[in-house]
């Protein structure tokens, strides 16, 4: 106690570093329910959610999950795993995330297209490392969350390895990237017959209403606003998401498809909405109602 400043502690959490096969380090941040006295006591089965762009979203997701303990429908929470980079003074490593979060294509730009390598790293390195830290906890289900390029990653993971996770959460996915190449994967996914009797995965897609139709800020110059509005129209964040959902509607390989537009949110502000809603539904409202 006293008035001497000290660092702000974050209970029920830890972080560590893992390297991929190329020797590149990743920051792995993990949190678990605030009411746990320790993480070694046998518990479960519990859900776990993996979140990319972890530097920007770990605290947001952790606090959102902890706040649910005061809700009437709290189901015990789950484990949050955020995957990021060793950074100081910033939240994003533009070069590394551009490679890690975009799918491989025949005409991928230089420095992009490493999603499969990154997903292999999550499955073969991150997942076992996290599970080793909770030896007495049994896992019920797993989700993958990503925003923007991360949302594109979540879609690519669903379309190419649908059994890797039980739920894929694509927040404001960059469907526009590389001439809408992800839609070719979506088409192949829809046209492939389901061969397994296991429950199909679910998909959540969301975006902010201001992403495609931004308002003008009070202090914004008209020329700047017009340029920003043109870019928003070209990216078609809402329309692309709606087109994708229409393509996937009724797909037998999906258990549920949930689409949400967050009114009055832009590409940055919508992150807190989608991560809170995504983990809340995945932790507490599972299984989702089956799509018709």
From Swiss-Prot:
Phenotype of null mutants: Eliminates TAFC esterase activity and causes increased intracellular accumulation of TAFC and TAFC hydrolysis products. Reduces the intracellular transfer rate of iron from TAFC to DF-FC and delays iron sensing. Causes a decreased radial growth rate under iron-depleted but not iron-replete conditions.
Induction: Expression is induced during iron deprivation.
Main location: cytoplasm
Protein name: Siderophore triacetylfusarinine C esterase
Pfam short name (any one): Esterase
InterPro entries named in the record: AB_hydrolase_fold, Esterase-like, Siderophore_Hydrolase_D
Purpose of the protein: Displays specific triacetylfusarinine C (TAFC) esterase activity but does not hydrolyze fusarinine C, which has the same core structure as TAFC. Hydrolysis optimizes but is not essential for TAFC-mediated iron uptake. Both extra- and intracellular siderophores have been shown to be crucial for the virulence. Subsequent to chelation of iron and uptake, FsC and TAFC are hydrolyzed and the iron is transferred to the metabolism or to the intracellular siderophore ferricrocin (FC) for transport and storage of iron.
Catalytic activity as recorded in UniProt: triacetylfusarinine C + 3 H2O = 3 N-acetylfusarinine + Fe(3+)
Biological source species: Aspergillus fumigatus (strain ATCC MYA-4609 / CBS 101355 / FGSC A1100 / Af293)
UniProt GO MF annotations: hydrolase activity, acting on ester bonds
């Amino acid at each position: 106690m006293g008035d001497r400043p000290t660092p702000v502690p974050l209970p029920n959490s830890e972080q560590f570093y893992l390297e991929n096969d190329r020797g590149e380090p990743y920051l792995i941040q993990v949190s678990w329910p605030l009411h746990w006295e320790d993480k070694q006591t046998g518990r479960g089965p519990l859900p776990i959610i993996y979140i990319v762009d972890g530097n920007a979203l770990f605290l947001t997701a952790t606090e959102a999950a902890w706040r649910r303990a005061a809700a009437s429908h709290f189901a015990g929470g789950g484990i949050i795993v955020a995957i990021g980079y060793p950074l100081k003074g910033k939240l994003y490593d533009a070069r590394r995330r551009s490679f890690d979060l975009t799918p491989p294509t025949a005409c991928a730009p230089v420095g992009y297209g490493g999603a499969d390598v990154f997903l292999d790293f999550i499955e073969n390195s991150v997942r076992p490392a996290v599970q080793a830290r909770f030896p007495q906890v049994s896992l019920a289900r797993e989700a993958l969350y990503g925003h923007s390029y991360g949302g594109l990653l979540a879609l690519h993971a669903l379309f190419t390895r649908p059994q890797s996770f039980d739920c894929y959460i694509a927040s404001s996915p960059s469907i526009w990237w590389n001439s809408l190449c992800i839609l070719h994967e979506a088409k192949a996914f829809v046209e492939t017959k389901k061969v397994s009797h296991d429950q199909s995965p679910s998909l959540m897609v969301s975006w902010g209403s201001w992403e495609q139709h931004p308002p003008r800020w009070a202090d914004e110059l008209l020329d700047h606003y017009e340029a920003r509005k043109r870019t928003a129209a070209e990216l078609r964040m809402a329309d692309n998401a709606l087109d994708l959902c229409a393509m996937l509607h009724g797909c037998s390989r999906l258990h549920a498809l949930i689409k949400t537009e967050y009114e009055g949110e832009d590409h940055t502000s919508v992150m807190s909405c989608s991560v809170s809603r995504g983990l809340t539904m995945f932790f507490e409202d599972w299984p989702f109602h089956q799509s018709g």
